[in-house]
Regions:
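Extended low-complexity, serine/threonine- and proline-enriched intrinsically disordered segments
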Residues: 1-5, 10
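Aromatic sugar-binding surface patches on proteins
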Residues: 9-35
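Short acidic/polar inter-strand loop motif in beta-rich domains
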Residues: 27, 48-55
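Beta-strand/loop edge motif enriched in small/polar residues
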Residues: 31, 65-238
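Short, aromatic- and glycine-rich surface loops/edge beta-strands on solvent-exposed regions
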Residues: 32-49
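Short beta-strand elements
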Residues: 52-68
Length: 238
């Protein structure tokens, strides 16, 4: 860890500023520089033993170095491609793939959800980031380079983020890892025109469910093949 000196911007402003030099290199401890690489998680802690009311206060702020940030409330329209060379992608709250739109995610891409964060207060989980799909989601990983959907935390736990919800939209997942969410992959209100396919993937360490399909009319085609579903305490498949 490196230390940064913070200076208040003015008298009683409550705004503190500081800086540290960063370089893309191997870690060297205590050299006054922060060595980083693309996708590294940067976390800043500020602790005040006596805040405004005499009580100890602490502030934590987290960001990803060289990440594509997809902000809470983003709506994806038309055809959109996410790829490893433009990633990782940091989702800070609920994101919607609109009806008629297609989001394609290519092999090796990391999609990271900011833990316990959602300013939209919407979706299935009001206080956690989710990827909601009313259009089409195609996730095409490979055995050598799967697509990862995971938490922003360095020490992640189940329930850090909401999950991937197909709200009457279709979803195809091949060589995908979904971990540390609340409900994993959730098909809601699907019918015969909204297939959900999960192949050669890993669904693990989610708080409640691994893969769910409910509230449809019974005609939806759901295919799960060659997939490891483990440590999803309520149900692996529901």
């Amino acid at each position: 860890a490196e230390e940064v000196v913070l200076t208040e911007s003015g008298v009683d402003t409550g705004i503190f500023e500081g800086s540290i030099e960063m370089e893309e290199a191997a870690v060297v401890k205590g050299d006054g520089k922060l060595q980083v690489g693309s996708g590294d998680l940067l976390t800043v802690f500020y602790e005040d033993p006596q805040g405004d009311f005499g009580d100890e206060e602490s502030v934590r702020s987290t960001a990803l170095y060289s990440a594509s940030v997809v902000r809470a409330g983003t709506s994806i329209l038309g055809s959109t491609l996410w790829s490893q060379d433009k990633g990782p992608y940091l989702i800070t709250g609920d994101v919607m793939v609109n009806e008629g739109a297609t989001l394609t995610i290519l092999e090796g891409t990391r999609v990271i959800f900011l833990a316990n964060s959602d300013s939209t207060l919407g979706g299935n989980e009001r206080y956690d980031a989710e990827l909601n799909v009313k259009g089409s989601l195609s996730v095409v990983g490979s055995e050598e380079a799967p697509v990862e959907f995971t938490s922003s935390e360095q020490s992640p736990v189940a329930g850090d983020w909401g999950g991937i919800k197909l709200e009457g939209g279709s979803g195809s997942f091949t060589h995908v890892v979904v971990e540390y969410s609340i409900y994993g992959i959730y098909g809601s209100g699907l019918d015969g025109s909204d297939p959900m396919t999960v192949e050669s993937s890993v669904i693990r360490h989610n708080r409640d469910y691994g893969i769910t399909n409910r509230d449809g009319n019974g005609t939806a085609k759901v295919v799960i093949k060659g997939t490891e579903i483990v440590d999803n305490p309520k149900y692996g498949i529901y």
